[in-house]
Amino acid sequence: MKPLHLLTGVLLAALCLPAAAEDNTIDPALLAVIEARDEDDKARDQYRHPAQTLSFFQISPGMTVAEALPGGGWYTKILAPYLGSEGAIYGVNYSDRTWPMFGFMSEDTIKTRIASTGKFPGMVGDVTDSGIEAAGFTFNTVPPELSGTADRVLFIRALHNLNRFESQAGTATQALAAARSLLKDGGMVGVVQHRLPEDAPDEGSDGSRGYLKQSQVIAMLEKAGFELVASSEINANPKDRPGPEDIVWRLPPSLNGSKDDPDKRAAMTAIGESDRMTLLFRKVD
């Protein structure tokens, strides 16, 4: 009889999606960049595992990387200095018409968000003086000269809202088409996404609550012309078991709905940031 742990391993291999082999080798240069950030940014590392995540995505200095929805630049502050002067980084944002769809932003806020796209190179310049090439554009305004130049496109906690407005405006389709256009032949897409359990009702997986199912994301990328290369549990959090009405923003760092309730806040803080899938895809013909 085979040992139980071997049988378990065989069963998992049969049931699970392709998983990356664990490789504890992380570029010391990447670790140095991560360590050099301010303490507020580093406080999130225990949940976001940037060194392991970027290593899993096989990112290295000199690459051209497009970051979808860079926001305040949490990952930009790592990528820009790490890619270095021989690399390039692009910040790719929602199309201008997407912002009003959220329904809760004032006109001034919408204008600020739209303007932030063009300010991405300035953000990069504030992070590093290496002279790295930087550009900011939207999913529907990819510069033709950048087509086929990217080694990686990253969707880090970015796909839920793109899926949320897919039926209304084709936002996910547009974003993945932009990714495919940007990538070199054989280039890869890295995904980190809040994960809804596979046995949860589908109503919670439209993106409006922040969560998507892993099978749903894989199908979405495959339909757009990518193949799954590997999956990882780097960013998994088994403590996060969302109920039918739970939103991802109930958890840190947002803590929506509990900031004035110490007990609820403590409970959400104890869970930590969300359970997340980490997936790597390759562009295929």
Feature map (PLM): residue ranges:
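S-adenosyl-L-methionine
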Residues: 105-142
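C-terminal lobe and adjacent flexible extensions of AdoMet/dcAdoMet transferase-like proteins
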Residues: 224, 264-285
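A short acidic, Gly/Pro-enriched loop at the edge of an enzyme's catalytic core
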Residues: 143-154
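Class I SAM-dependent methyltransferase Rossmann-like catalytic core
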Residues: 26-56, 60
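Conserved class I S-adenosyl-L-methionine
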Residues: 62-71
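Conserved beta-strand signature within the Rossmann-like core of class I S-adenosyl-L-methionine
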Residues: 186-194
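A short glycine-rich, Lys/Arg-flanked "PGG" loop and its adjoining helix->strand segment in the class I
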Residues: 169-185
